[in-house]
């Protein structure tokens, strides 16, 4: 039994479920249908849940000025309401172009002079910083004749990519500077051996045996703890029998 357990953990570390879950959430080049993208695709301000992925802005009823605008943040949809498979992602982590991740090096820090420099996990620990990457969203603004005009009949007037937040990056995830693929791009290599990867981690003051799976917030390592919820999204109240 011990041999089977050891064999399993050679390919799956103890925190693999944390890293795999975060990678599934993260919007990266190899994950166009990330959970981040799905959240943006389902954005809706309508009470009935229609117009998913878009925001309609209409002028006040008493005002004669203003335009009917449609702001699209999600991916394009067909007439059947389904996401078009060829539609490019609209949310990007660490870069304004998700289709080009060649320049992505992991989390960054904005220095006092306004310049941005790569931030390694060790530097974040020593400087009491947050290990984060910027998140960008592509906004498309269309002008409509009325509040009921379909998106496909509206006129495109502007497109812009906007930084919306900074996202904490899990150590050893696809968005971390210690990720094997990110390290390979940083060293400008086609591939990297286990020995070369371990040597790189040591050069960054990291333990090659560290499985990751945690965040660095304010220089402190923070880990998510899995709990079994008895009743999700419900408040449980018990009567005090003593009173």
Task: Kindly label every feature range from the protein language model.
Residues 1-243:
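Conserved N-terminal architectural modules of multi-subunit, DNA-dependent RNA polymerase core subunits
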